[in-house]
């Protein structure tokens, strides 16, 4: 149920009847304050100006045509021409009933699209670090939301599995006689990578062999391909452990690494030349883009093939976008890549559009994100100033949560304690990130994220268990409640019901904008509204059974909405805390 969409259409029709153009925007928004109703239509200002009318005069005319019978109990004009809409308690009660009768809580299924989501993208032969956290969990929240809405989602883990470094790694693997690399841990590979690089920099003979190995690998030699495959397999096996710990939905089947696009690159360069988009410049193949200027104010040159014949990330990204449209049949492509890559992506996509590889009707969206910072406001590092490994961060989260949970539940059995600590610890790390607007940097703070107050995972998980405890005390099951009517008489009942029915609107925003913090804010607000409702509207000690059961149904929908909402974020809920 999308009340905002329903009201938007009703107000739009009334505006047209009042003389507004057919493409007018009613600008219906959820009201920020209770006194302004549940929704506000703010579109009169812009339209009245075009019509040469006062906004309030237009609003008055719109009201004469606006039929919200059975939807709103009151509609009023406020200020210079805002229209405030107060939802009818009977309408709220009816739709709460409908939401409870549906597995999807009344959320409609939009027109199905094929959506490719590019996220996580770790590098082969390197362990995942905190820099991979945001892309992985924000991308996963978007994927879960889009899938819940009914879209076909293709997860694309754009792994860094190709490049000149593989000659060096294979040469070092061979030199160390480590053909048993399948048994290596990725932690070994981290040191292995450093040692290989050191050797490459200091031993010219080794470096020459490494360069030859790159050529052999790129020409498809079976032995070198097998060695490369070992390095990829070890890396992805270790990364899968991290994905599983993080409760994200990526699997080995979702790997679409850089190597996938290699066979396409010569054809892309030849085609761009044939189309007159790419030209030779100082021995390299370059596309000059008028949209981007260099310091001299001239069109910027984007290299797609180096003088030595090598390709660049841009070339791969052009091939990648083409593949996602032509082969995966994407209707929309989302890239969860940090903000520092924005210009690079814009240049690659400008070439993609000019070449006609992806039509303008298929959006290519950079859902960029900021950095994770330490309390000092600088990039998050270890005490020694090194990069924080993601596995180490999750270990620390688990350890801190274990202490916190044990303190609050000294008699809890060990296995239950471990399960709860895992849900709280991993949930805290994820929620602290997801609850921030992804476009900004954020401060990583253990104390804040593990607090039981404020917009945190522990608070949200606790809020959910608190609602469940009402049911346990009521000693009533869902079947017994099903036939009971919902009656809304108190203001706090109406406020909670209206917010519950805004779940679909929240999902729609997350799906459209790729902003999980909007869902976090909604759930936090919902938990707060339930708390006020619980305090002022007695449930178990209600004046009669009818009111008791009605309030239990509001509590029931609150629990289901909190659980489903946290689910779309990849945050685990627990029955008791």
From Swiss-Prot:
Chain ranges for the short sequence motif 'HIGH' region as given in the UniProt record: 122-132
GO terms for MF: arginine-tRNA ligase activity; ATP binding
Top-level EC class: ligase
EC number: 6.1.1.19
Catalytic reaction(s) noted: tRNA(Arg) + L-arginine + ATP = L-arginyl-tRNA(Arg) + AMP + diphosphate
Subcellular location: Cytoplasm
Listed GO CC annotations: cytoplasm
Record-linked InterPro entries: aa-tRNA-synth_I_CS, Arg-tRNA-ligase, Arg-tRNA-synth_N, Arg-tRNA-synth_N_sf, ArgRS_core, DALR_anticod-bd, Rossmann-like_a/b/a_fold, tRNAsynth_Ia_anticodon-bd
Keyword Chloroplast: no
Keyword Cytoplasm recorded: yes
Pfam families referenced in this protein's UniProt entry, alphabetically: Arg_tRNA_synt_N, DALR_1, tRNA-synt_1d
GO biological process, one term: arginyl-tRNA aminoacylation
Keyword terms: Aminoacyl-tRNA synthetase, ATP-binding, Cytoplasm, Ligase, Nucleotide-binding, Protein biosynthesis
Protein family (similarity comment): Belongs to the class-I aminoacyl-tRNA synthetase family.
UniProt-listed PANTHER family: ARGININE--TRNA LIGASE, CYTOPLASMIC, ARGINYL-TRNA SYNTHETASE
Binding partners and assembly: Monomer.
Protein name (Swiss-Prot/TrEMBL): Arginine--tRNA ligase
Organism of provenance: Escherichia coli O81 (strain ED1a)
Gene that this sequence comes from: argS
């Amino acid at each position: 149920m999308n009340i905002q969409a329903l009201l938007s259409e009703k107000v739009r029709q009334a505006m047209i009847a009042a003389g507004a153009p057919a493409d007018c925007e009613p600008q219906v928004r959820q009201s920020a304050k209770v006194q302004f109703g549940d929704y506000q239509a703010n579109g009169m200002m812009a339209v009245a100006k075009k019509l040469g009318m006062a906004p309030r005069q237009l609003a008055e005319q719109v009201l004469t045509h606006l039929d919200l019978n059975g939807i709103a109990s009151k509609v009023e004009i406020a200020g210079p021409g805002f229209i405030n809409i107060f939802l009818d308690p009977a309408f709220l009660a009816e739709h709460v009933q409908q939401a409870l009768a549906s597995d999807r809580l009344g959320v409609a299924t939009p027109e199905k699209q094929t959506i490719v989501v590019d996220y996580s993208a770790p590098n082969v032969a390197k362990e995942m670090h905190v820099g991979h956290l945001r892309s992985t969990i924000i991308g996963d929240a978007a994927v879960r939301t889009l899938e819940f809405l009914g879209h076909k989602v293709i997860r694309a883990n754009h792994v860094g599995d190709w490049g000149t470094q593989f000659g060096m790694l294979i040469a070092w693997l061979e030199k160390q006689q480590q053909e048993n690399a399948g048994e290596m841990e990725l932690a070994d590979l981290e040191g292995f990578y450093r040692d290989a690089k050191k050797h490459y920099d200091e031993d010219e003979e080794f470096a020459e062999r490494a360069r030859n190995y790159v050529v052999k690998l790129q020409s498809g030699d079976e032995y070198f391909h097998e060695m490369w495959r070992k390095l990829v397999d070890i890396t992805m096996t270790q990364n899968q452990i991290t994905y599983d710990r993080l409760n994200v939905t990526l699997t080995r089947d979702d790997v679409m690494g850089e190597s996938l696009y290699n066979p396409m690159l010569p054809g892309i360069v030849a085609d761009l030349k044939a189309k007159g988009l790419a030209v030779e410049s100082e021995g390299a193949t370059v596309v000059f883009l008028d949209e981007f200027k260099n310091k001299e104010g001239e069109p910027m040159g984007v290299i797609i093939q180096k003088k030595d014949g090598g390709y660049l990330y841009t070339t791969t990204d052009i091939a990648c976008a083409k593949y996602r449209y032509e082969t995966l049949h994407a209707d929309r492509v989302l890239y969860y890549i940090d903000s520092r890559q924005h210009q690079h992506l814009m240049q690659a996509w400008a070439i993609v559009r000019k070449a006609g590889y992806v039509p303008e009707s298929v959006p290519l969206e950079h859902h960029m994100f900021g950095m994770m910072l330490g309390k000092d406001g600088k990039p998050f590092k270890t005490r020694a100033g090194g990069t924080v490994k993601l596995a180490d961060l999750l270990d620390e989260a688990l350890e801190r949560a274990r202490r916190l949970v044990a303190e609050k539940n000294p008699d809890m059995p060990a296995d239950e304690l471990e399960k709860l600590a895992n849900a709280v610890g991993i949930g805290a790390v994820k929620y602290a990130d997801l609850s921030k607007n992804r476009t900004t940097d954020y401060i990583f703070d253990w104390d804040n994220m593990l607090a039981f107050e404020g917009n945190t995972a522990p608070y949200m998980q606790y809020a959910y268990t608190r609602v469940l405890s009402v049911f346990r005390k009521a000693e009533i099951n869902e079947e017994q409640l099903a036939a009971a009517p919902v009656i809304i008489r108190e203001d706090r009942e109406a406020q909670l019901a209206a917010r519950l029915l805004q779940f679909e609107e929240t999902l729609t925003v997350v799906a459209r904008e790729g902003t999980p913090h909007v869902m976090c804010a909604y759930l936090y607000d919902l938990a707060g509204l339930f708390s006020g409702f619980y305090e002022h509207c007695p449930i178990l000690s209600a004046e009669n059974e009818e009111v008791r059961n009605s309030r239990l149904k509001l509590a029931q929908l609150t629990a289901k909405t909190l659980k489903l909402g946290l689910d779309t974020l990849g945050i685990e809920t627990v029955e008791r805390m």
